């Protein structure tokens, strides 16, 4: 019994360093918010301007890697000897469900406004050209390219899970073929795992920082409760307590049901927006945007704007590529685990087609609705953002739809459930990654899960206290830098091991 408790306890070398690092950074930030904002702006400017090109080349190289997997020697290799665990329809649905987070609802509703008001390629703000490129850029940032990069990492993790039969809960476990067992399980592997965990903590705190204002703004619209930072903190605290109760009382089945409800409600809400907003315009705008994407794709791939220095690729493309990089390992592990028994080609094609369809539907419907509301002068987004913040502007794009009260209730429930499942997933992932030998199907210790959910909640509150999108963008970019190298090492380790051990 003692031995079992020891096995499921924390792993000090990957538990305490991230905890201490993140705790110190939060303390320094809260101590002087103005100084923290100065540092944040400097970090954002340095990384995006000096190293933005590296993120763009990373995505392009990983895209070529996707083609190599689909048409190369491993295309017909099966990831495990068992038949697929899920039907193709269920598999695709699970992929869609993974895309319906509150952060996705945040960006899907407001992103097009930023692209139109501060457009790329020297276009005039709010011009016809800017509007024509608005949705096309969303389809670029949330389309086949990033999902192709995830395909490569998902194949790598599925290979280590189901072909090599490895227990992978941290990235260092996959680096034995590349770095050797001594280094992968030694100091080098510990450093890699700590980079991963610090970045993941900030990424999850960022998602909470995006999701919480949506819920509190919904509460203000529905119940008249003023949206304040204190209310944000109270709501985050309630989510943490609710998560602790669910875990302590064995209500994980309830959380899974909530996740399913979130997915079905997402379909319902998107269908409603599509019908009442203007189905004909949405389909025409989407079709035109696909054409614009194909026409501008080469420039989008390599756009760094070093001459005009307008800042668009740094503020958006590099930011989003860092976003994809920082979530790559966590997301790829999930996608790999639900893809047992499929061939490499099936996994690559299924991910790119299924997940691209998911994100394209979300961004097309929500972005088109926002554009229509702007063009018809139904809402004034710049004024809303200036007076009340981005979250209020997003809420108003939903409140402007017919049957506004019912629509807002649906959106409120969707955001609330999405954030409950987010906090649960955050605490579970971090607890699994910082505990010793917690195998698949086992639960990490309750106190560890609660502790991590509290820390993620604190980060969300700190980012909200800083105000604006720049702190959130900087947290993602800073976290994406070390994981940029970790993702590359995992990929190279897979290639090296597969060449030696995955032969006919």
From Swiss-Prot:
It catalyses: 4-(trimethylamino)butanoate(in) + (R)-carnitine(out) = 4-(trimethylamino)butanoate(out) + (R)-carnitine(in). It is found in: Cell inner membrane. It is a multi-pass membrane protein. PROSITE patterns: BCCT. Disulfide bonds: none annotated. Keywords: Antiport, Cell inner membrane, Cell membrane, Membrane, Transmembrane, Transmembrane helix, Transport. InterPro entries: BCCT_CS, BCCT_transptr, BCCT_transptr_CaiT. Pathway: Amine and polyamine metabolism; carnitine metabolism. GO terms for biological process: 4-(trimethylammonio)butanoate transport; carnitine metabolic process. The chain crosses the membrane at residues 10-30, 51-71, 92-112, 143-163, 195-215, 231-251, 263-283, 316-336, 347-367, 398-418, 446-466, 475-495. HAMAP family: CaiT. Belongs to the BCCT transporter (TC 2.A.15) family. CaiT subfamily. This is L-carnitine/gamma-butyrobetaine antiporter. It comes from Shigella flexneri. The gene is caiT.
């Amino acid at each position: 019994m003692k031995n079992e408790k020891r096995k499921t306890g924390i792993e000090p070398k990957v538990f305490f360093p991230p905890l201490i690092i993140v705790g110190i950074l939060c303390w320094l930030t809260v101590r002087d918010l103005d100084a923290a904002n100065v540092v944040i702006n400097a970090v954002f400017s340095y990384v995006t301007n000096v190293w933005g090109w590296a993120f763009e080349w990373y995505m392009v190289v990983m895209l070529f890697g996707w083609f190599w997997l689909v048409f190369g020697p491993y295309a017909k290799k099966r990831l495990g000897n068992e038949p697929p665990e899920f039907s193709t329809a269920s598999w695709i649905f699970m992929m869609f469900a993974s895309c319906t987070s509150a952060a996705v609802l945040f960006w899907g509703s407001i992103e097009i406004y930023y692209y139109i008001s501060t457009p790329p390629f020297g276009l005039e703000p709010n011009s016809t050209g800017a509007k024509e490129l608005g949705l096309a850029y969303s389809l670029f940032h949330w389309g086949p390219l990033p999902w192709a990069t995830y395909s490569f990492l998902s194949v790598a993790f599925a290979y280590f899970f189901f072909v090599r039969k490895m227990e992978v809960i941290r990235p260092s476990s996959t680096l034995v073929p590349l770095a050797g067992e001594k280094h992968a399980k030694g100091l080098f592997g510990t450093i890699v795992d700590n980079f991963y965990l610090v970045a993941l903590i900030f990424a999850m705190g960022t998602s909470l920082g995006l999701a919480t204002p949506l819920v509190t703004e919904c509460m203000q619209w529905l119940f008249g409760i003023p949206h304040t930072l204190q209310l944000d903190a109270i709501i985050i605290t309630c989510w943490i307590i609710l998560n602790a109760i669910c875990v302590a009382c064995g209500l994980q089945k309830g959380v899974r049901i909530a996740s399913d409800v979130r997915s079905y409600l997402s379909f319902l809400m998107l269908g409603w927006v599509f019908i009442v907003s203007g189905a004909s315009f949405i389909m025409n705008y989407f079709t035109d945007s696909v054409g614009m994407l194909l026409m501008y794709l080469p420039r989008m791939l390599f756009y760094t704007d070093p001459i005009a220095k307008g800042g668009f690729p740094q503020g958006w493309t590099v930011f989003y590529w860092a976003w994809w990089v920082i979530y790559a390992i966590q997301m790829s592990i999930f996608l790999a685990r639900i893809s047992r028994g499929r061939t490499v080609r099936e996994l690559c094609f299924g991910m790119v087609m299924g997940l691209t369809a998911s994100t394209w539907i979300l961004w097309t419907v929500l972005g088109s609705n926002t554009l229509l509301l702007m063009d018809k002068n139904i809402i004034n987004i710049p004024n809303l953002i200036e007076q009340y913040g981005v979250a209020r502007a997003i809420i108003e794009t939903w409140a402007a739809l017919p049957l506004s009260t019912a629509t807002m209730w649906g959106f409120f429930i969707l955001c609330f459930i999405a954030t409950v499942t987010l906090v649960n997933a955050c605490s579970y992932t971090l607890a699994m990654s910082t505990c010793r030998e917690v195998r698949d199907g086992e639960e990490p210790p309750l106190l560890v899960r609660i502790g991590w959910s509290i820390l993620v909640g604190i980060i969300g509150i700190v980012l909200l206290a800083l105000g604006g999108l720049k702190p959130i963008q900087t947290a993602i970019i800073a976290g994406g830098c070390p994981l940029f190298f970790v993702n590359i090492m995992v990929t190279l380790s897979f290639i090296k091991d597969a060449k030696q051990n995955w032969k006919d």
